[in-house]
Amino acid sequence: PYEKIGAELVKEVAKKTDDVAGDGTTTATVLAQALVKEGLRNVAAGANPLGLKRGIEKAVEKVTETLLKGAKEVETKEQIAATAAISAGDQSIGDLIAEAMDKVGNEGVITVEESNTFGL
């Protein structure tokens, strides 16, 4: 039963991460899996589950605070292109994404679909 609960939790983490950020699902899944595994191990060893939960919540707050301190706004077309190029692993795709974002604006939506045509 615990394995099923853990699997459902990890699935939910991946879905929520994808919905909110659109990226990072692998990292979130690995972290969630480690938290579940270590949490169950600690509970089996006698740790208080509520104490573990509170500790995890405090750690999440601290990590979030630290990440937000180091975060930088991506504002210019060049910054968008550079960030997108890193994510895509391809500068030309980064440039295309920056161009599309420039055209639709901050509130616009860009839909990317896989092509079935060779070379496109």
UniProtKB/Swiss-Prot annotation:
Keywords, in A-Z order: ATP-binding, Chaperone, Cytoplasm, Isomerase, Nucleotide-binding, Stress response
Protein residues bound to ATP: 23-27
Superkingdom, natural source: Bacteria
Principal subcellular localisation of the protein: cytoplasm
Keyword RNA-binding: no
Outcome reported for the amino acid change (mutating residue 37 to R): In strain: 85-961
Signal sequence segment: none
EC primary class: isomerase
Compartmental location: Cytoplasm
GO CC annotation terms, alphabetical: cytoplasm
Catalytic activity: ATP + H2O + a folded polypeptide = ADP + phosphate + an unfolded polypeptide
One MF annotation (Gene Ontology) recorded for this entry: ATP binding
GO annotation terms (biological process): protein refolding
Disulfide bonds: none
Outcome when changing residue 78 to D: In strain: 85-961
EC number(s) given by UniProt: 5.6.1.7
Coiled coil spans: none
Assembly: Forms a cylinder of 14 subunits composed of two heptameric rings stacked back-to-back. Interacts with the co-chaperonin GroES.
Family the entry assigns: Belongs to the chaperonin (HSP60) family.
Known function: Together with its co-chaperonin GroES, plays an essential role in assisting protein folding. The GroEL-GroES system forms a nano-cage that allows encapsulation of the non-native substrate proteins and provides a physical environment optimized to promote and accelerate protein folding.
The protein, known as: Chaperonin GroEL
Species of provenance: Mycobacterium kansasii
Originating gene: groEL
